[in-house]
């Protein structure tokens, strides 16, 4: 049985195209002692993947010929560890492949849920980042104003919804009128500022008349600098 993988055929110098990737077939991997054979069910394809190709993040740069790394939800097909059994659902650092092997102590056993995609989204990296960042660092209190940049993104969207559930006034920052409308209408933010329009500081002052108690930053740069001016 062969294992399909998507590898980096050529590192990009500009926008990604199909020519940057190649589909190959390799022998099925065999788990060693303390390892598990995993079938990749769902994988997360994120904007950060592009940064990995440039080495502009915390992880080593992806090289030409490498299978593209990813975060994935997988099923244990074979286990050589007492930690896990065949049929378990786990989260793992994986690659764009049908099957991978991994050390059992480096994967996380997950509860079985009706909708597996929830394990990738709200219970995955984005949801955990939003929850722990807001609750462990921000410590919002009902009635406070929470400002969130990249509010239409996965982390920002979760942050805003959690803050609203806690009784906070939530103001988002996003790019473009359609995103801002979606953030307010669908995610329930109290307001959303379009950073592409002129007058960001004036818009922040209008949307946050009592100042900002918690700012959840997802972008840095000028948006961060402008937002810090309104912190209580």
Positions of PLM-derived features:
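Alpha-helical segments flanking ligand/cofactor-binding loops in enzyme cores
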Residues: 38, 85, 160-161, 181, ...
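NAD(P)H dinucleotide-binding glycine-rich loop of Rossmann-like/cofactor-binding domains
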Residues: 68-75, 86-150
